[in-house]
């Protein structure tokens, strides 16, 4: 056992030494890769994801599930094998995109609203791109077609739902319709908003760190001696944004890349997965299956609507903040509503006193 540990330590030291040498020798492309990663974070990831992460945190703390109609609760349970507390989590995950669903599910698990098995199920299937990334960043910017971006969003969303139904059918026998009671904090709305922003900022910074690391690593592959097909495969498997850029002229592959998510996204949710004991192979298998389903749905839609295809080649692609204003506007609107409501509650409380 000691010899095995010694071998691992030696191998780790050698690997770190090689990486260090590569960083020195190829410092210019690595710097450019990190710079590209920062651009992706500032102009693509954070504007589309951060508002939904904040809203998700506020929703699980402030929105009660008590008034969910019984028929919706039953339909949701028999579809996904999940309690009514998970309805808002799944909706937020589908709208916010990865990794918002995993982030919110992890928070609900920590609060005791979801069991480990329920949170695990959500994290495995609620992992897709939101409409902002699919339609605007991928469709409009990369493929020059919002309609194709809509097709990408539809295929990835349907893939998530189908995957969730399959996982629900597998684990439904061990679940019950009765859900744990929601545990709401007694803090004011302004305090809830502050806490939500703080937690979302921390999660966003971790995700951006992973994006910069993978962007730097992929920059090393941009070598003239490496075949373009190898670069495309590496990008598709590793990082979703770069993978979409490389495959923007192949809608079916593009749909698969979106549903796969990339190893970078898988690393981003690793912390959440560890909380509910999700194995790496489970993520790989489920996401690979989701990618196949998404590609098949895209293939069907393109055969029904053959005119909806990207004819433009990607040339000198640069990340542009197409929808950053939407996210900022949403945050400001929610902020104003919360503080107005909180002000009314405070005034009413003071009058009663």
Predicted stretch roles:
Residues 24-35, 61-65, 136-138, 218-229, ...:
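Transmembrane helix-loop junctions in multi-pass membrane proteins
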Residues 106, 123-127, 131-182, 215, ...:
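Alpha-helical transmembrane segments of multi-pass small-molecule/ion transporters
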Residues 43, 48, 52, 56, ...:
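Alpha-helical transmembrane segments in multi-pass membrane proteins
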Residues 64, 193, 197-262:
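Transmembrane helical segments that form the transport core of multi-pass membrane transport proteins
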Residues 14-29, 34-44, 50-54, 58, ...:
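Selected transmembrane alpha-helices and immediately adjacent juxtamembrane segments
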Residues 78-143, 234-247, 252-276, 285-289:
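Alpha-helical membrane segments and immediately flanking helix-loop junctions
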Residues 114-121, 131-133, 160-161, 252-345:
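C-terminal transmembrane helix pair
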Residues 2, 63-72, 91-107, 151-155, ...:
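Hydrophobic alpha-helical transmembrane segments
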């Amino acid at each position: 056992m000691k010899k095995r540990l010694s071998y691992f330590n030696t191998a780790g030291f050698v690997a770190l030494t090689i990486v260090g040498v590569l960083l020195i020798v190829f410092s210019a492309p690595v710097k450019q890769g990190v710079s590209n990663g920062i651009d992706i974070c500032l102009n693509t990831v954070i504007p589309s994801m951060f508002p939904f992460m904040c809203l998700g945190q506020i929703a699980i703390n402030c929105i009660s599930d008590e008034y969910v109609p019984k028929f919706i609760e039953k339909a949701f349970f028999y579809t996904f094998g999940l309690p009514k507390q998970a309805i808002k989590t799944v909706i937020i995950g589908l709208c916010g995109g990865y990794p918002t669903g995993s982030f919110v599910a992890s928070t609900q698990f920590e609060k005791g609203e979801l069991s480990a098995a329920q949170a695990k199920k959500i994290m495995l299937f609620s992992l897709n791109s939101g409409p902002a990334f699919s339609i605007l960043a991928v469709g409009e910017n990369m493929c020059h077609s919002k309609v194709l971006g809509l097709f990408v969003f539809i295929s990835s969303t349907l893939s998530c739902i189908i995957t969730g139904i399959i996982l629900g059918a597998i684990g439904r026998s061990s679940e019950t319709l009765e859900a744990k009671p929601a545990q709401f904090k007694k803090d004011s709305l302004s305090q809830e908003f502050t806490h939500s922003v703080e937690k979302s900022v921390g999660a966003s910074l971790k995700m951006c760190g992973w994006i910069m690391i993978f962007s730097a690593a992929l920059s090393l592959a941009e070598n003239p001696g490496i075949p373009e097909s190898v670069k495309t495969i590496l990008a598709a498997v590793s990082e979703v944004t770069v993978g979409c850029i490389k495959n923007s002229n192949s809608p079916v592959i593009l749909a698969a890349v979106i549903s796969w998510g990339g190893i970078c996204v898988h690393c981003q949710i690793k912390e959440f997965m560890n909380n509910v004991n999700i194995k790496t192979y489970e993520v790989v298998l489920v996401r690979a299956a989701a990618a196949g389903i998404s590609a098949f749905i895209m293939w069907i839609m393109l055969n029904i609507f053959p005119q909806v295809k990207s004819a433009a080649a990607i040339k000198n692609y640069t990340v542009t903040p197409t929808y950053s204003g939407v996210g900022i506007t949403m945050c400001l609107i929610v902020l104003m509503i919360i503080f107005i409501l909180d002000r009314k509650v405070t005034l009413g409380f003071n009058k009663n006193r």
